[in-house]
Each structure stands twice: as structure tokens, then as C-alpha cells.
């Protein structure tokens, strides 16, 4: 299972604008910094050769080690047998809730990616 998390800022992204010469263009928008955080996992079944996608959105807050542990428990309920988790070296993967889950769940094995290798993780794309 490949696991990763990301965040999206919902602010306008203006590429081009137009205004008469001498007038600075003003683009009105609400200065609210709404955001959505997401955590997802891509699974590959070795026997049936099927892929699975598990995703959870958390609007308005950051993904913490608590959400990572809850997400892992939810995904483990859907999968059978031993599960190998491949993830980056993020600090939220080393929080107390995640460490407690890893010690309680013997069928869960973790393999970290090398230092900076997003191209190795299909969940990043």
C-alpha cells in the first residue's frame, strides 16, 4: 500500500488580466484561506492483481498523526492478510498514535521511501 497526504488551498489563481494603460488591475476576491487536506492510499492485490484507492478529505484542517492512524485502521478493515505500507519520512507518520497502531497490529509492516523520492510513490501523482 502506498500512502501519502496533501493539502489544497482554495484561493484564486490568476494567470492573466487586462486593464487600460495606467490603471492597475484589481481582482476582487474574498481573502479567506479555505483549504482541504486529503490522505489517500493506493493498494495492489498480489493475488488478484487489482488496484484499490482509498481517500479521505478533511476540510479546514491539517492531517495529523491522529488522522493517519484513524485512516490506517479504516483501510486495514478493508484489507486481508499482511499489509506493507510504503510512505515518506513525514513527521506525522512517526506520531504516538501511529506508533501505537504499528505495535498493536502485527500484520502491518512499514517501509519508508528514500530521503526525497516522490517519483517512487504512485500516490503522489
Model-derived regions: residue spans:
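Short, solvent-exposed loop/turn segments at secondary-structure junctions
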Residues: 10, 93-94
